A protein has these predicted regions:
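Conserved core of the sugar-phosphate nucleotidyltransferase
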Residues: 1-82
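Conserved alpha/beta core of the MobA/IspD/sugar-nucleotide pyrophosphorylase nucleotidyltransferase superfamily
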Residues: 59-125
Protein backbone atom coordinates (compact mmCIF):
# COMPACT_ATOMS: atom_id res chain seq x y z
CA UNK A 1 0.00 0.00 0.00
CA UNK A 2 2.91 2.38 0.71
CA UNK A 3 4.25 1.75 -2.79
CA UNK A 4 0.84 2.58 -4.26
CA UNK A 5 0.69 5.73 -2.17
CA UNK A 6 4.10 6.84 -3.41
CA UNK A 7 2.99 6.27 -7.01
CA UNK A 8 0.47 9.10 -6.61
CA UNK A 9 3.47 11.45 -6.66
CA UNK A 10 4.16 10.54 -10.28
CA UNK A 11 1.61 13.31 -10.87
CA UNK A 12 3.63 16.51 -10.32
CA UNK A 13 0.50 18.27 -9.03
CA UNK A 14 0.22 15.98 -5.99
CA UNK A 15 1.71 17.66 -2.92
CA UNK A 16 0.23 15.55 -0.12
CA UNK A 17 -1.45 12.15 -0.12
CA UNK A 18 -3.16 9.73 2.21
CA UNK A 19 -5.23 6.55 2.11
CA UNK A 20 -8.98 5.99 2.36
CA UNK A 21 -10.66 2.62 2.72
CA UNK A 22 -13.97 1.46 1.33
CA UNK A 23 -14.24 -0.67 4.49
CA UNK A 24 -16.55 1.68 6.39
CA UNK A 25 -19.01 -0.24 8.54
CA UNK A 26 -22.39 1.02 9.73
CA UNK A 27 -21.05 1.27 13.31
CA UNK A 28 -18.17 3.42 12.06
CA UNK A 29 -20.51 6.10 10.75
CA UNK A 30 -21.57 7.10 14.26
CA UNK A 31 -18.20 6.50 15.90
CA UNK A 32 -16.37 9.77 16.58
CA UNK A 33 -13.08 7.87 16.80
CA UNK A 34 -13.35 6.80 13.15
CA UNK A 35 -12.35 9.63 10.84
CA UNK A 36 -14.33 9.75 7.62
CA UNK A 37 -13.34 11.53 4.41
CA UNK A 38 -15.38 12.55 1.42
CA UNK A 39 -13.78 13.12 -1.94
CA UNK A 40 -14.23 14.99 -5.17
CA UNK A 41 -14.34 13.24 -8.54
CA UNK A 42 -10.51 13.24 -8.73
CA UNK A 43 -10.09 11.62 -5.28
CA UNK A 44 -8.99 14.82 -3.58
CA UNK A 45 -10.25 15.30 -0.04
CA UNK A 46 -13.17 17.67 0.32
CA UNK A 47 -13.40 17.25 4.08
CA UNK A 48 -12.50 15.01 6.99
CA UNK A 49 -15.11 14.52 9.66
CA UNK A 50 -15.82 12.53 12.80
CA UNK A 51 -19.58 13.07 13.09
CA UNK A 52 -22.55 15.03 11.70
CA UNK A 53 -22.30 13.30 8.35
CA UNK A 54 -24.18 14.68 5.38
CA UNK A 55 -26.53 11.92 4.20
CA UNK A 56 -26.09 13.17 0.62
CA UNK A 57 -22.33 12.52 0.65
CA UNK A 58 -20.26 9.37 0.20
CA UNK A 59 -17.66 8.72 2.88
CA UNK A 60 -14.61 6.52 3.20
CA UNK A 61 -12.72 5.43 6.29
CA UNK A 62 -9.55 7.50 6.57
CA UNK A 63 -6.35 5.58 7.24
CA UNK A 64 -3.95 7.95 8.96
CA UNK A 65 -0.91 7.41 6.77
CA UNK A 66 0.42 10.54 5.06
CA UNK A 67 2.96 11.21 2.34
CA UNK A 68 4.29 14.64 1.38
CA UNK A 69 6.62 16.29 -1.03
CA UNK A 70 9.49 17.72 1.01
CA UNK A 71 8.56 21.36 0.38
CA UNK A 72 4.94 20.65 1.33
CA UNK A 73 5.97 18.94 4.55
CA UNK A 74 8.17 21.93 5.41
CA UNK A 75 5.27 24.28 4.70
CA UNK A 76 2.77 22.16 6.64
CA UNK A 77 4.95 21.98 9.75
CA UNK A 78 5.51 25.74 9.66
CA UNK A 79 1.78 26.51 9.69
CA UNK A 80 -0.09 27.24 12.88
CA UNK A 81 -2.97 25.00 13.82
CA UNK A 82 -6.16 26.23 12.20
CA UNK A 83 -9.31 26.79 14.25
CA UNK A 84 -10.93 24.02 12.23
CA UNK A 85 -8.11 21.63 13.15
CA UNK A 86 -8.39 22.50 16.85
CA UNK A 87 -12.19 22.24 16.91
CA UNK A 88 -12.32 18.84 15.19
CA UNK A 89 -8.98 17.45 16.45
CA UNK A 90 -7.97 16.55 12.89
CA UNK A 91 -4.52 17.70 11.79
CA UNK A 92 -5.27 17.15 8.10
CA UNK A 93 -7.74 20.04 8.23
CA UNK A 94 -4.74 22.37 8.64
CA UNK A 95 -3.66 21.36 5.13
CA UNK A 96 -7.11 21.86 3.62
CA UNK A 97 -7.58 25.17 5.45
CA UNK A 98 -4.32 26.37 3.89
CA UNK A 99 -5.18 25.23 0.35
CA UNK A 100 -2.94 22.17 0.38
CA UNK A 101 -4.81 19.52 -1.59
CA UNK A 102 -4.76 15.97 -0.27
CA UNK A 103 -4.96 13.21 -2.89
CA UNK A 104 -6.42 9.96 -1.56
CA UNK A 105 -5.51 6.45 -2.59
CA UNK A 106 -8.68 4.34 -2.42
CA UNK A 107 -8.17 0.87 -0.97
CA UNK A 108 -10.34 -1.99 0.21
CA UNK A 109 -7.89 -2.46 3.08
CA UNK A 110 -9.72 -3.68 6.15
CA UNK A 111 -8.30 -2.71 9.49
CA UNK A 112 -9.37 -1.85 12.97
CA UNK A 113 -7.43 0.82 14.77
CA UNK A 114 -7.02 1.10 18.50
CA UNK A 115 -7.58 4.76 19.33
CA UNK A 116 -9.26 4.59 22.73
CA UNK A 117 -9.53 2.08 25.60
CA UNK A 118 -12.88 0.81 24.31
CA UNK A 119 -11.23 -0.16 21.00
CA UNK A 120 -8.66 -2.20 22.90
CA UNK A 121 -11.39 -3.99 24.86
CA UNK A 122 -13.24 -4.79 21.62
CA UNK A 123 -10.04 -6.05 20.03
CA UNK A 124 -9.25 -8.33 22.97
CA UNK A 125 -12.72 -9.96 22.80
Amino acid sequence: MIDQLSQLFEDPCVEMASIASTDLKEDDLNNDNVVKVNLDEENNAISFIRNNLNPESTYYRHIGIYAYRKNTLNLFTSLSQSDNEKNHRLEQLRALDNNIAIKLLISDFSHRSIDVKEDLKNYEN
